[in-house]
């Protein structure tokens, strides 16, 4: 049985999205003295690794895309900062996050986990999706607080009624 994350990656690949795309950039700062385009340069500073190693799950054209099914608060922060870095560097026009709305009742309804042989274990499925797991409400509050900079972000929150055990 394929995990939702693996299935999602296959769909993205079929649509020609590149997976695990990283951005790195140096910054060139030029200081000029005087007015106008002909003002002489008085100093030049290069800041290496100004943007260093931010990653998005998927990228194609002007869109960065992240899939966060069992996200923690800090994961959203990382994703929004990556979107911001890609956007400010002129690489993307929009970031998209697909996540789930809190649906812990659904996970509780699944009962116990199975081992690799299909035998029920003592651990519940819902234990993986505990109190530290967040949903769209935490993501929206982070976007409202400006964590994505000027990058527009489209959030798709999958509701509990749209999830089936199949």
Regions found by a protein language model. Name each.
Residues 52, 56, 70-144:
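Catalytic cores of nucleic-acid endonucleases
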Residues 31-33, 132, 146-147, 154:
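Generic detector of intrinsically disordered, low-complexity, polar/charged segments
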Residues 64-67:
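Glycine-rich active-site/cofactor-binding loop and its immediate structural neighborhood
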Residues 27, 101-102, 163:
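Positions that flank functional sites
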Residues 1-61, 74-81, 88:
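Active-site metal-binding core of divalent-cation-utilizing nuclease and nuclease-like domains
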Residues 23, 99, 159:
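Residues at the C-termini of beta-strands that transition into short coil/loop
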């Amino acid at each position: 049985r394929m995990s939702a994350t693996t299935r999602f990656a296959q769909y993205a690949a079929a649509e020609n999205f590149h997976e695990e795309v990283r951005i790195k950039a140096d910054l060139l700062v030029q200081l000029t003295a005087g007015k106008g385009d002909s003002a002489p340069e008085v100093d030049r500073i290069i800041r290496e690794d100004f943007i260093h190693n931010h990653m998005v799950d998927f990228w194609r054209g002007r869109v960065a895309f992240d899939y966060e099914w069992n996200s923690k608060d800090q994961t959203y922060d990382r994703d929004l900062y990556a979107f911001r870095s890609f956007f400010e560097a002129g690489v993307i026009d929009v970031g998209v996050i697909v996540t789930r709305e809190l649906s812990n009742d659904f996970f509780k309804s699944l009962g116990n986990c199975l081992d690799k042989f299909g035998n029920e274990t003592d651990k519940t499925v819902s234990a993986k999706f505990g109190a530290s797991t967040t949903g769209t409400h935490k993501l929206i509050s982070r976007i409202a607080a400006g964590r994505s900079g000027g990058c527009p972000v489209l959030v798709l929150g999958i509701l509990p009624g749209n999830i089936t055990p199949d």
